A protein has these predicted regions:
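Multi-pass alpha-helical membrane architecture of UbiA-family
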Residues: 1-329
Length: 329
């Protein structure tokens, strides 16, 4: 019995729940959009999901990060032996094969429930997200492709959140929907860019030529400051082009400005401390900037929920990070 308890503790530790808000709130962007457009445009086809259904979707979205993280840890063992030597799978505290088996069983169950209880079509982004997650580690070896693949894997959560809610009217993809998906992709591609700084040494030795490894710390930290403006510039360009037609509330703009501040603060932290012991702890601000950006997008469709999620995400991302005192994990 003791070994099962120890395995469970190591498995949960490896799930790194402080990141779960990334997949959770990215997916809820899709749910919020579905609930917004259904009564206005598609009440004859689409159906507002029940509270029970939404809770299942939310549970799957938050679970998605941790379950898939087990596969990432296994595929990233060579660099993690340097970057994160105290992670359970690296130290042997977590049996890799058993952990992979557990994640596979859970994902199979999620697929089964999605097909038979949620919406069969939601299996498409679900399976796409799993495959993109598996492709992420190899993609890291090819510069910007790691960022591209990671961003797409999180964007699949947004698509899943939308399609899992209920019947979806055609067309599935419009310029407004694609614009929001692009912004979710961009936020996450930027987030993972900053995360590469803490992994510089291990990635370099393991042959993972991320952008930071390819161009070096000094050039990369300057690019980080420049790239922090990309999301806000992109959104303004998209909005001014008329791709987003929903009137934007004052609440959205306030959350948007706060998100821009978090993005700039993230860039400053990595510019000042790009590769030392403080770098790992800059991840909390980096993650907040990404997750709060997701919450701000929800503000386009539901500003009260967006405000709540923004505050909850900001508080609990920091709280969960603070529970992990060992930066080598």
């Amino acid at each position: 019995m003791k070994k099962y308890i120890e395995f469970t503790k190591a498995y949960v530790k490896s799930m790194r729940f402080y990141y779960a808000f990334i997949t959770g709130i990215a997916g809820w962007v899709g749910v919020s959009f579905y609930e917004y457009v259904t009564p206005i445009f598609y009440s004859d086809i689409q159906v507002i999901p029940s509270t029970e259904k939404k809770m299942i979707i939310l549970f799957f979205l938050f679970l998605a990060w941790g379950i898939n993280q087990i596969f990432n840890d296994y595929m990233g063992l060579p660099e993690d032996r340097i970057n994160a030597p105290n992670r359970p799978m690296v130290t042997g505290e977590l049996n890799a094969k058993a952990a992979l088996a557990v994640s596979t069983v859970i994902l199979t169950g999620v697929c089964f429930i999605t097909y038979y209880y949620l919406e069969p079509i939601a299996l498409i982004p679900l399976l796409a997200g799993i495959l993109l997650n598996l492709a992420y580690e190899p993609a890291k070896a090819y510069g910007i492709w790691g960022n591209v693949v990671y961003g797409l894997s999180i964007t699949s959560c947004t698509v899943f959140g939308f399609l899992a809610c209920g019947p979806a009217a055609q067309p599935l993809f419009t310029k407004e929907r694609i614009s929001i998906l692009f912004m979710v992709w961009l936020l996450n591609a930027l987030m993972t860019y900053f995360s590469y700084f803490k992994d510089y040494e291990g990635d370099k030795i393991a042959g993972k030529r991320t952008i930071v490894v390819k161009y070096g710390i000094e050039k990369s930290k300057v690019f980080g400051v420049i790239s922090a403006f990309f999301p806000s510039i992109s959104f303004i360009a998209i909005y001014m082009s008329g791709c987003i037609t929903v009137p934007l509330s004052t609440t959205f703009w306030i959350l948007g400005v706060l998100t821009v501040f978090l993005q700039m603060w993230t860039a400053c932290l990595y510019y000042v401390n790009p590769a030392d012991k403080k770098t790992a702890y800059s991840l909390a601000t980096n993650t907040r900037a990404c997750v709060c950006g997701h919450a701000a997008f929800i503000g386009i469709y539901n500003d009260q929920l967006a405000t709540l999620l923004f505050l909850v995400a900001y508080i609990f991302v920091g709280f969960l990070f603070d529970l992990h005192k060992n930066s080598n994990e």
